[in-house]
């Protein structure tokens, strides 16, 4: 275990992944985060676990959105970075999940697992987390067994926020002070912010 950004991170484990159990701070609201939360919260409140795929091109804020949703739920969150992973949850990952019993699990860059993704999900079914969130840059490149109906409860595409959100956050005076070019740049910022 090592400390990183005030969290304990399980590193140098046989799976080769950074497994980070932590409690996330409250997240700012955004229209898309509010929409997704409105879809999953009634189930979580009723005690029914939910599984969510967040899909979108790189840089749209899927990872931030995943943290936002997990923070809204509260409780213990397990962040797993799958960047370049091949052996996630074969042995040590499942042991960590069973030991920590997180309320939410976030699997970042899930599409990087390739053919190992189905095995990973099968292992996660044994973990009784209330919320499973996976992020992917290319849903269509994933094994059809992953995206078949019934495997995940919800699929959301993450995109940019748009001008209305930033007018609310920045205030109309500040927004109007931006040049048209800068307004266009800000409008393209990820939806998770």
Model regions: which residues?
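Conserved catalytic network of the ASCE P-loop NTPase/AAA+ motor domain
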Residues: 44-47, 71-73, 95-101, 121-129, ...
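Conserved nucleotide-binding/hydrolysis micro-motifs of P-loop NTPases
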Residues: 84-86, 111-112, 138-141, 160-166, ...
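Short glycine-rich substrate-engagement loop in P-loop NTPases that contacts/grips substrate
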Residues: 37, 73-101, 114
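AAA+ P-loop ATPase mechanoenzymes
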Residues: 1-49, 57-58, 65, 69, ...
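Hydrophobic anchor at the beta1->P-loop junction of P-loop NTPases
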Residues: 54
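Conserved catalytic/switch belt of AAA+ P-loop NTPases
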Residues: 109-149, 154
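Walker B beta-strand of ABC/ABC-like P-loop ATPase nucleotide-binding domains
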Residues: 105-106
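Conserved AAA+ ATPase small/helical "lid" subdomain
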Residues: 160-167, 173-193
